[in-house]
């Protein structure tokens, strides 16, 4: 029974993580959840900058990762952390406004 339970958890993990594996690029909003809830880029996922290494189990090291925040400061910190963890394609897209222009994405307001 324990083996079945473990397999089930793994299947759920793969199902939830599949979109991250399948995309050519990932857009990550590293702001706080409160900031995210005021609006974020279409297609972005939310991971606060200090938790950015949580992607290591689901995102390949050579995947292109765009990071943005309010001003570019926290996304710069997140980029540095990812670079040090071996992510060579981490890109600081700067502020949400700059990232919107760079990535040609709309802002989704909640």
Go through each PLM region and give its residues:
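Rhodanese-like catalytic fold shared by cysteine-dependent sulfurtransferases
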Residues: 2-6, 24-26, 33-63, 73-110
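Sec-dependent signal peptide recognition
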Residues: 6-13
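Hydrophobic h-region of N-terminal signal peptides that target proteins for export
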Residues: 13-22
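Short cysteine clusters
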Residues: 69
